[in-house]
Amino acid sequence: NWGYPSRALRTKDFLYIKNFRPERWPAGDPCAINNKGELEAMHSAYHDIDACPSWDFIVSNRDDREIYPYFLKAAGKRPYEELYDISSDPGCLHNLVGNGKCTEKLTNLRKEMDKLLKKTKDTRYLDNPAQDDIWETYPRLSGAIRTFPAPLF
């Protein structure tokens, strides 16, 4: 039931993403706990992806080497930072963080992101750690609370 906090900055040629909680599942937890308190099957949840035949196919065939990359892109955990050259990689398939050729671009986009978060008083801004998890403290106003296994961290 936790959110997946991330912020993104896009320029003409690049997309920079900062994932503030990379230990979380961006598509929701992979399995849930049912009403009897029993752990459901792995890959039976991902409640932040709407049910549809294409997702059912990807989950059912995730062990296929050709399908697995799509499964990871849809449901896999993300690194703390992502950088994509959207002019040459519009599908954002190749994360350039760690690519020595993009160090200067990454540094500049980090600075721009920090300036923007500070200017907009974003609660995820690093200078305000007391507000970092404020979103986790608000009560849920509608809908059932689902139960998931405790995180392993």
Feature-to-residue mapping (PLM):
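C-terminal cap/loop subdomain of S1 sulfatases and analogous C-terminal strand-loop tails that border
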Residues: 1-82
